[in-house]
């Protein structure tokens, strides 16, 4: 891991909170992925080299796939999977589990935040990411929940936040 000064974490909504749900061919999803790519490239140009992803369904996996795609252009960047607990993907459908495993296999680092599920493990994962970053990229619709809590925690910790509004 590169350490906090050159590290960027990500937070965003799960598939169930996205207006297009599972339909990644929806123009809004395509537009969001383009915004994510632009945000990650901007972060790289500002000196970010290490990217941390919470590996949740939805925006987290879009972010991880974006970083992995950009590694061919920027081979010095690294991707860390910050996993809240080993059972994170257990309740997902087979297609999403396969996607998760594929991304995980391509990560440079894997951090297991705790060894079993507890009600607070997702929040602990989010705090781990913020505590190890100097920039947080956030896809946010402003609603209460884990994404908003992570953004608020980043502000309290003095971590810069790049907000990508969810249209």
PLM region descriptions:
Residues 1-167:
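Acidic/glycine-enriched connector segments
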């Amino acid at each position: 891991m590169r350490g906090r000064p050159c590290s960027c974490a990500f937070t965003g909504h799960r598939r169930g909170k996205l207006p297009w749900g599972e339909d990644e061919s929806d123009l809004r999803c395509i537009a969001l992925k383009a915004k994510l790519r632009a945000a990650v490239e901007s972060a790289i140009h500002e000196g970010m080299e290490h990217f941390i992803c919470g590996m949740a369904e939805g925006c987290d996996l879009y972010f991880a796939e974006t970083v992995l795609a950009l590694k061919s252009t920027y081979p010095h960047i690294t991707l860390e999977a910050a996993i809240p607990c080993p059972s994170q993907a257990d309740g997902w459908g087979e297609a999403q589990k396969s996607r998760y495993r594929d991304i995980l296999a391509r990560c440079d680092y894997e951090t297991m935040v705790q060894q079993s599920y507890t009600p607070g493990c997702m929040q602990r994962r989010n705090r781990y990411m913020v505590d190890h970053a100097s920039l947080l990229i956030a896809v946010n619709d402003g609603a209460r929940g884990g994404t908003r809590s992570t953004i608020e925690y980043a502000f309290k910790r003095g971590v810069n936040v790049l907000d990508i509004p969810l249209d």
